[in-house]
């Protein structure tokens, strides 16, 4: 018998992600009551207004936005990015989504997002049909980890939140990150393998 995960668990996670929408007002509030250190204040200020310091604090964000903007609808072409040639710092890690937008355009970026959404949908199906609660919770944990990484990376690249240094799962360069993601996928596939199909 399948373990039917109650979807209110997912709504709690969605509410947690919804608090990201209030990151700006919360940051301004913390600055006004002096809870932030000066370097933290400068980082948030560079996030809110990257044009105020375009050669230092706002450089990476602005170059990422230039890459996204220069991609247009269909992009420059695969491998034809200009920003990855030293203009955009960490273009292979934190800012890989900006390079995807530049090379593949809006259609490529939307395709990547749709692939991640489909993966998350499949995680939900596996969690919903898992044979026991433990397996369902394992899958929900992996799903949450990957979903949060995707949301944070894309939000940083589009300057929706301050820079966090989070990589884009399965796409960003990095040995340890990919290793742990593959281990997590192995856990999910193990739970999926235990699901009994109805005949």
For the regions a language model picked out, list residue spans one by one.
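Structural signal for the C-terminal ends of transmembrane alpha-helices
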Residues: 1-6, 22-23, 117-127, 188-195
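Membrane-interfacial entry segments at the cytosolic side of transmembrane helices
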Residues: 2-16
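Hydrophobic, glycine- and aromatic-enriched re-entrant/interface helices and adjoining loop segments
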Residues: 13-109, 133-134
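Generic alpha-helical transmembrane segments of integral inner-membrane proteins
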Residues: 13-18, 110-118, 182, 186
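Membrane-interfacial segments
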Residues: 30-31, 124-131, 164, 195-199
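Transmembrane helix-bundle signature of multi-pass membrane transporters/permeases
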Residues: 87, 99-102, 142-146, 174
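Hydrophobic transmembrane alpha-helices and their immediate junctions
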Residues: 106-150
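A juxtamembrane structural motif centered on a specific transmembrane helix
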Residues: 149-199
């Amino acid at each position: 018998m399948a373990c039917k995960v109650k979807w209110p668990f997912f709504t709690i996670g969605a509410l947690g992600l919804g608090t990201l929408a209030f990151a700006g007002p919360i940051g301004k509030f913390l600055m006004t009551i002096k809870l932030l250190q000066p370097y933290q204040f400068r980082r948030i200020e560079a996030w809110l207004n990257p044009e105020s310091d375009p050669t230092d604090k706002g450089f990476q964000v602005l170059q990422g936005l230039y890459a996204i903007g220069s991609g247009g609808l269909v992009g420059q072409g695969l491998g034809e990015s200009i920003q990855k040639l030293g203009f955009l710092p960490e273009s292979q890690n934190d800012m890989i989504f900006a390079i995807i937008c530049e090379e593949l355009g809006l259609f490529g970026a939307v395709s990547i997002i749709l692939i991640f959404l489909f993966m998350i949908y499949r995680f939900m199906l596996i969690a919903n049909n898992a044979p026991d609660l433990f397996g369902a919770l394992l899958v929900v944990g992996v799903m949450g980890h990957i979903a949060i990484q995707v949301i944070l990376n894309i939000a940083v690249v589009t300057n929706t939140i301050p820079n966090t240094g989070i990589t884009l799962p399965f796409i960003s360069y990095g040995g340890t990150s990919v290793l742990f993601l593959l281990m997590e996928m192995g856990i999910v596939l193990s739970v999926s393998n235990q699901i009994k199909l109805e005949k």
